[in-house]
Amino acid sequence: MRITIYTRNDCVQCHATKRAMENRGFDFEMINVDRVPEAAEALRAQGFRQLPVVIAGDLSWSGFRPDMINRLHPAPHAASA
């Protein structure tokens, strides 16, 4: 599954999302909307108003959403429970 995370400089929720995805071993592409303004415009056109925006297959969301990350891959401790 292809995962893309749209971020911006100095975005605390973006950093938290990146860490959570790395901790679960996901491969993902990051696009910084400060460097790619047309990406920001495209996200706004899709109704997103907050970063990060994560697009993972058929799922997409904005903000730091551990619940959505867990839908992609449960946290290690959840798998053993």
Swiss-Prot record:
* One MF term in the entry's GO annotations: electron transfer activity
Q: What induces it?
A: Induced 2-fold by hydroxyurea.
- Which GO BP terms apply? cell redox homeostasis
Q: Which cysteines are joined by disulfide bonds?
A: C11-C14
User: What does the UniProt keyword field contain?
Assistant: Disulfide bond, Electron transport, Redox-active center, Transport
Mark the transmembrane ranges.
none
Entry-linked PROSITE patterns: GLUTAREDOXIN_2
Q: InterPro entries recorded for this chain?
A: GlrX_NrdH, Glutaredoxin, Grx-like_ET, Thioredoxin-like_sf
Annotated ranges, domain Glutaredoxin: 1-81
What residue range is the signal peptide? Answer: none
| Similarity-based family | Belongs to the glutaredoxin family.
Q: What does this protein do?
A: Electron transport system for the ribonucleotide reductase system NrdEF.
This one is known as Glutaredoxin-like protein NrdH
What is the protein's species of origin?
Escherichia coli (strain K12)
| Gene label | nrdH
